[in-house]
């Protein structure tokens, strides 16, 4: 439960409302928020929320194309005679143990290229970080049973036109996050991080080769995406963000923008006093601080290291 986490939640619920979602499932991630914060927000946005771990409703019924659909979050909330769809944050291995549901959609973070069929249940998964939209079409027989299905991923790239109402919500979110950063207590100043210009006094050829890497333009990618004031993004696109003498903002500490020498080789003031003292080597562990599975799924240490070698 963090200030930025709350802003994200508010933006998501507002967006779901504008997009007229039929149902939204609350799971483990939402447990971090107190109910006196979360549920007034749900009421305000008129969000059709389902939650298995509270007094809130655990299922709801809607009708689409003359088919009665029961959407639930509790495996026990199945309705006989309806088409039953379960929303779950359980891993696929646990979803396979749930019987009696026609479709189970998981949000466990696992990537399923195609839905699985398990004991007459179709198990599908949302795409990590919502980069693709899953479209699942069911073929329903005259007996109301699922006879087959078709599935495809729709990439949500620039070719998909943005909804102006949702874009307004996201712009408002970015503005509020930027305000959080401005109002946050700035870490103590100090002669700690030197910046690439100081390193270049002795390592000028290395600076020149660094300029040709994507690390050198890391902060510009945030500016283009409108995320240059987002703390969750800044930490991997600057030097020493959140630390004494590290990057604070592009206005106050422009010399520490981008992924520079000290972000990878570490902070070692002793090296300036004794040049024979080497900086730390750039191991895979160092890279994995930012090149996580979530943000850099194709990361391959030897391949990526070659791209920044100098």
Segments (PLM) and residue ranges:
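Short sequence/structural segments immediately N-terminal
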Residues: 29, 49, 142-310
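Acidic, metal/ion-coordinating pockets
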Residues: 1-158, 165
